[in-house]
């Protein structure tokens, strides 16, 4: 696809320790010239963990976010130490620092672009399992974090109720739920086929129907 919208100049307006703020000169398809804001994350972003305990409950953290002046419920997450750091390492480190649990197994769930209109930041989200407690939290000076745990159904209801609004947390929880539904579908497909073969076209709707039922259950409680 040919893009008629294009950038002709980028000027650094302000540089911080993590972010750089730029003014981009953009030429629109009709020839107009506009100045757009662009925020560059020096390390490219970070990583996030969906930490699942042995009993199936999921760890979240509650912390105050000055940008929105209120507390939020979030999955453990943080920025990479460098642009080249393996995001799985980032996610495991942040999980241990913020919750005091070390994961024995990490599985990639999704990669998300958090603000494509004006920033290059991305977040890699991992499922963290086989959690082992370590010495405790290792927080930065400015961090005040309360550790909470919820069932998956509770978290889905909280998302639909608007209690959980953090984008990476919504993405991580729903990706985990989708993964479980797909795994259950695969197990069902392994079972001996006792249905008439003429019914086989209906099988393609099974996962979609399953996800629809899960969503309705989460909304209604």
Residue ranges and their predicted role:
Residues 11-48, 54:
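Acidic, metal-coordinating catalytic segment for phosphate/diphosphate chemistry
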Residues 1-5, 71, 141-197, 201-221:
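Nudix hydrolase/Nudix homology domain
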Residues 2-4, 9, 39, 44, ...:
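Conserved Nudix-box catalytic region and its N-terminal flanking loop in Nudix hydrolases
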Residues 45-48, 53, 79-167, 215-217:
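Unchanged
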Residues 29-31, 53-57, 64, 129-133, ...:
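Short loop segments at secondary-structure junctions
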Residues 12-17, 29, 41, 112-123, ...:
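Acidic pyrophosphate-coordinating catalytic loop
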């Amino acid at each position: 696809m040919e893009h008629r919208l294009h950038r002709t100049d980028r000027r650094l307006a302000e540089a911080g320790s993590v972010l750089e703020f730029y003014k981009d000169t953009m030429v629109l398809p009709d020839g107009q010239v506009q100045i757009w804001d662009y925020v560059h994350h020096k390390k490219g972003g970070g990583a996030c963990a969906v930490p699942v305990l042995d009993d199936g409950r999921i760890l979240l953290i509650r912390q105050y976010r000055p940008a929105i002046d209120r507390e939020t419920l979030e999955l453990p997450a943080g920025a990479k130490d460098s642009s080249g750091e393996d995001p799985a390492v980032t996610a495991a480190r942040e999980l241990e620092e913020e919750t005091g649990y070390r994961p024995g197994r990490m599985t990639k769930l999704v990669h998300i672009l958090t603000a494509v209109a004006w920033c290059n930041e991305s977040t890699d989200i991992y499922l963290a399992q086989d959690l082992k407690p370590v010495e405790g939290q290792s927080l930065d000076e400015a961090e005040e974090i309360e550790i909470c745990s919820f069932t998956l159904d509770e978290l889905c209801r909280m998302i639909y109720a608007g209690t959980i609004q953090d984008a990476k947390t919504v993405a991580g929880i729903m990706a985990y739920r989708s993964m479980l539904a797909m795994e259950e579908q695969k197990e069902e497909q392994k079972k001996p086929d006792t249905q008439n073969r003429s019914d086989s076209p209906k099988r393609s709707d099974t996962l979609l129907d399953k996800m629809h039922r899960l969503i309705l259950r989460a909304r209604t409680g």
